[in-house]
Amino acid sequence: MRLVTANVDRFDRVVVSNTGLPMYGKEPSAAFRAWQKFSQEVPVFEVGKLCNGGSQTDLGADVVAAYDAPFPDETFKAGARIFPALYPDGENDPSNIANKKAWEILHSFTKPFLCAFTDGDPVTAGGDRAFVGKVPGTAGQPHTTIVGGGHFVQEDKGEELAGVINDFMAATPK
């Protein structure tokens, strides 16, 4: 989301799925806190296995291996490992400051903005409520909940998500 708000002129429309832009003062779910703790404490961060666990379907050994491929050893996983720890846990937390600035821009973002969250992600299910009605571009859009998808919607319901995106693009030409 911060990429969008830092480059508004480069986007004609936005589709968000299984994401968020949290601010300090709103406690995350217990599932997120468990994920955050796990990410910092597990000795071996098995990216492919984690992606498989975040999906509703079994990804298969070849897909798990593809998710592991960019990370030949633990030293390559620092970014993936630290990402959950970037949750803004204080008013002056750098993530909180950056997210506040991003929300200021989103509150006046009038370009078409569609939410397509899944129902099967324990962390982000229902996350569309953070955007719909708060981002002006969400008005009148056909927001959808993709049933049966986990966090990695592209794996569980990739064709359905692609259809939602294609329909949205066709309905909102630039």
For the regions a language model picked out, list residue spans one by one.
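Conserved hydrolase catalytic core segment
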Residues: 1-26
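Short, solvent-exposed loop/turn segments at secondary-structure junctions
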Residues: 20-22, 72, 85, 119-123, ...
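Helix-rich cap/lid subdomain of alpha/beta-hydrolase
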Residues: 23-83, 87, 94-97
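Serine-hydrolase catalytic core
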Residues: 102-109
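Conserved loop-alpha-helix segment in the C-terminal half of the alpha/beta-hydrolase fold
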Residues: 113-149
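Catalytic active-site module of serine/aspartate enzymes centered on a nucleophile-bearing elbow/loop
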Residues: 139-174
